[in-house]
């Protein structure tokens, strides 16, 4: 079985928009030709698309950087530059995408073909044909292309198994999976033989089929990182039915009922919603001595926790090694799956509104002013820096336009209030100029 990569850290960068062009119409018999510079093309966006054929995040181990192409520059005759194609990145079903800096969930990719724009391409800069006015019919102004969005992301794969096997190490989960499916998990008589999830397709005699995941063994304290810890608890978040496998022979000296309670406590501690999933108790190793007596004691303790009118969890005595009781277990599992809906991983309120990434929040500051040790005033802020990088600093008219934009944003007034004097150095990024009062 292929290794399942649970998480991957990658960077994505959308393409920059193409620069607008400064050009003028110069043709014979056309006097006083006006501006003729076209707009730059848009930069390519980075789009994640779900491919149900992918089962792991293995590809992201070797390719961690994804960069879309930039748009082409504007041309003469008012022609626009060609926009860049979007970069499509294929991800498995069940991939959760988080912002690595904030930890917020950006999107949950669960449907085949689902697409989400992860990083938006930059807008193409406007050519000088766009800036013509009656007062300035021949402007030497053009914008640089807007930079594309850049992000650091964390990908997390939630296995899309219908049924998850949970239980203490060495209770027989791997053996059960190998017997009822074509999966070939590593099997051993020691703890944590399974260190990665194994998936197998199960088909019942009645023709029903479902995916079953043999998940690494849980121990008490797993939700706090003990043993194999929380990295594997996340795998059962998507399973619709949980098969709780218990070693009813108590071959390692533990009480079967205490095992049952301990594992359920870990599931509840990790995520309260896990306990909403229906559970079937699988009493394994029933071919071993004392298993029958232990099962009687288990049922008695379990019943004591319920009112007489409550429905007790289903219990199926089996032996994976002896192939006993498996057919009834699988048929009951298929029936339970048929009437169990999928569970949402997150409340809708936890998902980030995509608009928050493609616009500016009303409460966001347009700029910030700090002062370096060398007495230089430093201007920063997403909106201000965006205007700066889209300004062609090689043309005087563009610089004057940028100065007017700063004045309109209130930068000049804010500098005066902070004590800036005529001739003080001011810096935006690596560009430095003098403050003129």
Curated annotation (Swiss-Prot):
Residues 359-437 form the OCT domain. It is found in: Cytoplasm. GO terms for cellular component: cytoplasm. Transmembrane segments: none annotated. Mg(2+) binds at residues 174, 194. Residues 161-338 form the OBG-type G domain. It is an enzyme of class 3 (hydrolase). Pfam families: DUF1967, GTP1_OBG, MMR_HSR1. Its EC number is 3.6.5.-. Residues 2-160 form the Obg domain. Keywords: Cytoplasm, GTP-binding, Hydrolase, Magnesium, Metal-binding, Nucleotide-binding. GTP binds at residues 167-174, 192-196, 214-217, 284-287, 319-321. GO terms for molecular function: GTP binding; GTPase activity; magnesium ion binding. Belongs to the TRAFAC class OBG-HflX-like GTPase superfamily. OBG GTPase family. Monomer. An essential GTPase which binds GTP, GDP and possibly (p)ppGpp with moderate affinity, with high nucleotide exchange rates and a fairly low GTP hydrolysis rate. Plays a role in control of the cell cycle, stress response, ribosome biogenesis and in those bacteria that undergo differentiation, in morphogenesis control. This is GTPase Obg. It comes from Streptococcus pyogenes serotype M12 (strain MGAS2096).
